[in-house]
Every structure is written in C-alpha cells, then in structure tokens.
Amino acid sequence: MALACGSATDNTAAPGNTAGGSTIPGAGGGAVVGAGGGSASGPNASGGAAGGGVDVTPVGPCKAGVPVTTQIPLLLNRQYAAVVRDLLGVTAVGTTPVAELLVGDFTGAMTAPAWKVYQDVGEKIAKQVMATPDSKAKFISCAPTAADCLKTTIETFGRKAFRRALTAEEVAAFMTLNSATPAGTPDEVAEAILNAFLVSPSFLMIPELSTELATDNPPTAGAIKLSHQEVATRLSFLLWGSVPDAELNKAADDQLLGTKDQILAQAKRMILVREKTGEFISTFHSDWAQMNNSSAHWFKGKHDTAVYPDYTDASRVANKKELDAFFEEVAYTGSFKDLLLSNVAFVNKDNAVAYGLDPSKYTDALTKVTLDSATNPRPGFMTRAGFLSSYASYGSTSPILRGSFMAIWLLNVNVPAPDPSFALQTVTGDFKTNREYVEALTQKVQPCKSCHEAFNPLGFVMENYDGIGKWQTKDPRGGDITAATTTATITFASGPKTITSPVQLMQEIASQPAAKQLYAQAWVSFATGRSANENDQCTVDSLQTKLADDGYSILGLLGDLTQADSFRLRVRGSL
C-alpha cells in the first residue's frame, strides 16, 4: 500500500504560520509548516551546543528572566532512537542501530534530503514493527478489522507518540488512510498509519504551543506557561531522553504538573528509574568529556599495536562501556568531587590489563572494583582507560590533548584555536620522553609558547598513564618517567602551584570554583539543547553554589534543573 500522507495527519502545522519562513517538505509534495512563529529547526536554533551537546562559553553575570528558546526543536538522533525503542521495542532496523540510519544532528530548517531520510526510516520501522509480533503488539493490540480498532489505536498510540491527546481532526485525518486507494490489507493500513505517525511533525519535533500567560511571578510576567503535557515532555526528555511513561502522562492529563513541587515530585520518581536516567546521565558525561566523536581532538579509535599490543577493538569497546558505567555509578552514589577522585573502576577481561589486573580473573561482564589508591592511583574519570586512550596520539601519549581538555572544560582557560595560517612546527633531536619532545615542539616559537604554557603542564602530570591508559614508568622513546617528568607548575585562580601527581592535580581541580561553574553550565546547556545565556546564568550560579557542598549529589542537581522558572515557562522570540 503506497503511503502519501505527509503532514495531512498532523495539526502541528498551524495554518498561516510559516516558522519564520522555513518549511519542511512533506510527503507527496505537501509542506509541513512550523507553528506559532517558532523555528522548524534542530535543538540549537539560538546557536547553542551543536547536536544537543554541551557548551561552556562564558555568558556574563546573571540576569533575571526566562531565556528565549526555540519553540519547536527537532528530536535529536539519540532521542528519536530512544522514543522508537520505548514505544515500539525497536532498537535497530535489521542490524543497523536506529540512530545510525538518520542524518547527523543539525541546526536550522529541515532540508529536503534530511526529510527524505526521515521518510525512509519511518517506512522501514513501520514495516519491521508489523512483521515482529512483540513490536506490533506495542503499536496495535487489537485486530485491525475489529470495530473501532484503528480509531482506538490512533488515539492511544498517538497520545504517547505526540505527547498529548490528538484532536478530533487529527484522528479523522489518520483514519482516511483506511479508505485510501488502492486499498490495502488490514495490516497494510495499520502499517501506513504507523508510518504516518513516524513522519508527523508532532512526533519528529517537540512543539510547545501553549498561549497561557504566566502572572504568578513578577520577574516572569509576560512569559507563557507551558501546558501540563508540555511540562511532562520536558521532564521526560530531560531525565530519560525519551517520551513520558504512563504515570507521567496521567499526571499531565490530571493537571498535576503546574507547580514546582509537583514537578519535583515526578522528577524524583523518574530519577530512580536507573535504567533510563542512568543511560541519560552517561550520555551527558560522554558529551561533557568530548567522548562522543564530534569533538575535534585527533583520536579516531586507533593506536599503533606495535607500541600498544594490548589495545584491541574489544578493549576499545570495553573502555567505552566502563566510562558509561563509571559516570552512572558516581551520579547515583556520589558528587561532582567523586567524578574527579573516585577510585572505582569497571573491569572485564578486555580492559583489565590497562589497570594492571589479571584478565584471566574476569569475564565479558564488567565488574565493579575499587582500586588501591596507594598502589594503583586512578582518581576520577580522567584516569580511566577510555578517557586516556582517547586523549592520546597514535603511538604516544598526548599531554596537549589531555591538558587542553582540563584547561578548557574544567579550569575556564581561554584556549584560542590555532592560527590556520601558522605553519605546523617540526622539531628534531634525541628526545628520551614525550614530555621532552612536546616541550621542544611547543616552546620553539610564538605564538605556540604562550598558548601551550596554559595547558601543557596539566598534561605532563598525567605522563605516567601511557597512550592506552596503562601505568608506565618507561617512555616508548626509551627514557625513564621520573618525578621530574610528571611534576609541573600550574597556575590556578588562586595562583601557581607545584603539582607532582595525578591525585594532587585532581584534588586541586575538584576544589576550583571554575570547575563547578563549568560543570553546572554544561548541564544547563545539555538540558536545554542550546548555549546558556545570561538568564540561564542565574540557574548556573545557584547550582555552582550547591556543588561546593561535597554532599550535594549529581542526582540532586538533576532535580534542581527542573526547578528553574525557565523549565515551566517560555518566552516568545525570534530565533
């Protein structure tokens, strides 16, 4: 049965509104138009963190008010994948993960090629669902030929897929597929309806179309109060990266998400669903640590096996899983400080050697271990094999990459991009350690010298960890790694300090107000899908103050993100 529905089944496209002039091509030559003057765009229409990632660009002092945000952001690929998993039980089409079938996350108006990809993916998913009994039952639980089965399916599945109840007009539009020509079998009609849902704007986007003005708080007067369903959607995508569950939908339909206390109560419940929130927490921290393959650092997943014979495809996979497990564990049991100081590791037979452990004592499954801080110092995520092997060169460590990450993302050091007109430097000599080589290379001329002085020392302290994260006392260049190799003078906000070990370095970073401020700002950026601005800075400042308390948990931070006025209000703007 040929599907030609496009926007015909979805009233998100409000007549007369053109989303600031941008349109999304619909199937069959139709057009899906943005609603209410919003922008039919990705999550970063205001120029924020690309791909729904994190951004820590300084924004200035706090200014009371609700920030202007995009009105109809597009689902990120990871969100799309999570939604079809939760609604339909689909994690892959064939053997390809759903997110990998889509175009890369983007900003701006939907393009015709991107729209064609969404149509193709929706068609493939719908076909697979109808051919898979368990997935089919999640979509349609009655016989398509039974009286009112299709209408009931449209209403019940549509409530979940659109994150709101469908209008009578929308239900009727979906029902027209039952009388389309040429006629299809009952299962083909059901498949066409599911396909139509998967390409509808209210599924692919997260529209916020409420118009009720908020008048309860003078600083937010004139802002628009989100509907209870819109608040539920914000909650679910913030904490789960997916659609609301039945309990959250019921709270929304019962009008029980209008106050901060009501929102926080639901947030606390949802945070405890670890299989959902834990995954989202790991995703944030991977983005924050620039481990999501979108950052510009040089590592592309390969190392010289002649130098590092223990590094394999299996160890690389284990390293990624370990980092995810580490981030989740610290979030559920610790604080920001623990991210930088915890000696907990997750080990299996593929990554055990990186921690000096016997691989034969482990299986494929990751096992939580607490490493001996005296004999196996591994403070925090930046000493995990996954991080260290990513922030490394093909055949050596990279103090430059490791140091620049710490400088930019934890210490708020302004590291400008290299001048593209400046020639890449080379240096020759009998260098016994990588530190000697890097110092000769980057201290040779200006502007290299002044720039690298800001972050190279941070990386030098980490030279006992080799290019794949193992502890080393001998450099691959032949020299011994001594205390002199790993000692550096580093200038913090309070002044210069001599740092002699990774543990001392992480303790110092964990105590820095800048590190807490940047971490809070990264969360705000990630949660909103855009760069933080001066209105968001008020929330950032509040979270930074709370992070100064070592007893303040990361889960507490998640709950507090839902308490900002900007979580339940929005302001119209031109984005």
Language-model segments: residues:
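Mature N-terminal segment immediately following signal peptide/propeptide cleavage
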Residues: 59-60, 66-95
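Short, solvent-exposed loop/turn and secondary-structure capping segments
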Residues: 95-98, 167-170, 204-211, 215-218, ...
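Ser/Thr-rich, Pro/Gly/Ala-heavy low-complexity intrinsically disordered linkers and tails
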Residues: 1-62
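A cross-family structural signal marking well-folded subdomains
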Residues: 87, 198, 239, 249, ...
